[in-house]
């Protein structure tokens, strides 16, 4: 087992790790929030969350960056490997922009990926509270529900269909995952996601000793989860501060909830992961269909 935490852009992953081209089983990541946080400024002054405004020019630039990352992820993945993207919607000046749907559209337009499933991460205890405007102005046009969910978009590279692991709890096969977010100020990063999230995906779609990649490794939840599960991993970030943070977390105790560590077997013979090329048929659960 090996862990690499790399200072550099994942858009050049094949240059940083040419020996891993075509060897990654799973790419799992959460891109920087589109307009919520300036990560470079936060690395200098962590006491302040720097926010920027939504603009079409910036949106185009942001989507172009993501597309370059997904293209490089495709290069790094083995045939039949998976890409899992955790992303939230963009909220700016009262308007809601469907970033997850935009990413799915871009992935589809590339002609490279097989769409498997979108899982909805229900944050349970946290989110953007917007319902107050409805209480103040009880009219249909003022309906603004609280934002309590994010997307986990799952696509795969064409190739042999791999059976999921037999130690996957049945609740993970549902399209909604109830996971509490990381409590505020417990990790020195503006937007860490809970280790439970990559932990589930890594257990579902990889075997021990296989490779996992996170193009936006940030606080290191993905590389930490991979280590805990006996997988090799490579994570990228462009900020030295977050590289040091991710490395330091490798030795920390797991923060995965005890319930997630319990093994509740499912019959792997009843399922195969992902659709066949050109088809969108799926059976019960997460992007799976019966043989």
What are these regions (language model features)?
Residues 1, 247-261:
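Short, conserved SAM-binding/catalytic segment
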Residues 164-169, 257-267:
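Short, flexible loop/turn segments with low-complexity composition
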Residues 1-245, 279-291:
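Core catalytic lobe of class I
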Residues 99, 133-134, 224, 252, ...:
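Alpha-helix boundary/capping detector
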Residues 255, 259-263, 274-291:
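Short Lys/Arg-rich cationic patches that frequently serve as NLS/NoLS or arginine-rich RNA/DNA-binding motifs
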Residues 7-13, 263-271:
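Conserved SAM/SAH-binding loop
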């Amino acid at each position: 087992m090996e862990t690499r935490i790399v200072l550099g852009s994942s858009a050049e992953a094949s240059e940083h790790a040419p020996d891993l081209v075509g060897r990654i089983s799973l790419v799992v990541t959460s891109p920087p929030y589109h307009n919520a946080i300036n990560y470079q400024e936060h690395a200098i002054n962590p006491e302040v969350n720097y926010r920027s405004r939504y603009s079409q020019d910036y949106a185009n630039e942001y989507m172009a960056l993501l597309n370059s990352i997904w293209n490089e992820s495709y290069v790094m993945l083995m045939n039949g490997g998976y890409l899992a993207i955790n992303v939230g919607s963009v909220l700016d000046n009262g308007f809601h922009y469907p970033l997850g749907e935009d990413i799915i559209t871009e992935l589809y337009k590339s002609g490279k990926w097989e769409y498997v499933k979108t899982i909805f991460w229900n944050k349970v205890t946290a989110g953007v509270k917007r319902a107050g405007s409805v209480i103040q102005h009880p009219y249909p046009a003022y309906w603004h529900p609280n934002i309590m969910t994010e997307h986990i978009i799952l696509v795969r590279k064409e190739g042999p269909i791999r059976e999921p692991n037999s130690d996957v709890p049945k609740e993970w096969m549902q399209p909604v995952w109830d996971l509490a977010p990381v409590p505020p100020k417990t990790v020195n990063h503006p937007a860490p996601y809970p280790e439970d999230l990559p932990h589930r995906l890594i257990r579902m779609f990889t075997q021990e000793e296989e490779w996992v990649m996170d193009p936006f490794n940030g606080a290191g939840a993905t590389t930490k989860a991979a280590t805990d599960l006996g997988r090799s991993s490579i994570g990228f970030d462009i900020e030295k501060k977050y590289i040091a943070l991710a490395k330091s977390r490798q030795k920390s105790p797991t923060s995965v909830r005890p319930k997630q560590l319990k093994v509740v077997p499912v019959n792997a013979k009843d399922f195969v992961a992902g659709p066949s090329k050109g088809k969108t048929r799926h059976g019960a659960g997460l992007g799976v269909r019966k043989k």
